[in-house]
Swiss-Prot record:
Gene name of this polypeptide: TRI1
Purpose of the protein: May be involved in transcription regulation.
Protein's recorded name: Protein TRI1
SMART domains: SWIB
GO biological process, one term: transcription initiation at RNA polymerase I promoter
Subcellular location: Cytoplasm; Nucleus; Nucleus, Nucleolus
Cystine crosslinks: none
Extra remark beyond the main annotation: Present with 2360 molecules/cell in log phase SD medium.
Organism annotation: Saccharomyces cerevisiae (strain ATCC 204508 / S288c)
Annotated stretches, region: Disordered: 83-118, 200-226
Biased composition (Basic and acidic residues): 200-218
């Protein structure tokens, strides 16, 4: 296992930017083979287990996608170097130093306080079954996923023969059915998470519709009498 641990930073990086509904151990493994120019067929089982383990950890701790210790790896150093090269042209323009400084200050100030529209902060409304399961009417989406994963691990609901499969208990069944895969969880959750702004907008549209119908009905009455 120690030999494949060197792939952890890259596995985390791939998982953190991938759509959880579409990603799979096979795709991540193929990406590793291309990036490292190696054949991992002989270690397929170990690599798959590592990918599943990292996926679970990332879903449970969505705000800590890559461990700090792993940032010293070659791949992460390369990413940071490329990022610095992209930023270099902005720093080299000394004529606009004042504007650049004011922009950077504004960016820094903006980054210091959490954005209320950020996916990690913005709360969504939960469906009735999900409210009953988690005990809250609204939560940030990332917190919902984290709490579900904590419940899965605490109750040991992963299939021991296939860790990708979650065997739902009575509390989870109303939301996810009898079983699901760890990669389909996010897709299934979309049916139980609602944007408050969209609900308010929908309610306002519904209120306006009857008024329009009444107006049209009243306008048609004179024609009938004539």
């Amino acid at each position: 296992m120690a030999d494949i641990n060197k792939y952890i930073p890259m596995v985390d990086a791939i998982l953190s930017v991938s759509n959880p509904d579409e990603i799979s151990p096979k795709r991540v493994r193929k990406a590793l083979q291309i990036l490292y120019s190696v054949n991992l067929d002989s270690q397929r089982k170990l690599i798959n287990e590592l990918i599943l383990e990292r996926f679970g950890d990332i879903q449970e701790n969505p705000r800590v996608l890559i461990p700090k210790n792993d940032l010293i790896s070659r791949d992460q150093e390369l990413s940071l170097r490329l990022q610095k090269e992209e930023e270099r042209p902005l720093r080299s323009t000394r004529k606009r130093k004042g504007k650049s400084e004011s922009k950077s200050k504004r960016k820094k100030k903006k980054n210091d306080s959490p954005d209320s529209n950020s996916i990690s902060v913005r709360k969504v409304l939960l469906s009735a079954p999900l409210q009953k399961f988690l005990g809250s009417e609204e939560l940030p989406r990332t917190q919902v996923v984290k709490m579900i994963w904590q419940y899965i691990k605490e109750h040991d609901l992963q299939n021991p023969k296939d860790r990708r499969e979650i065997l739902c208990d009575e509390k989870m069944e109303p939301i996810f059915g009898k079983k699901m895969t760890m990669f389909s969880m996010n897709k299934l959750l979309t049916k139980h998470l609602f944007n408050p702004d969209e609900i308010v907008k929908h309610e306002e549209e519904q209120k306006q519709t009857p008024e329009k119908e009444i107006k049209l009905e009243n306008e048609s009455l004179p024609n009938l009498s004539g």
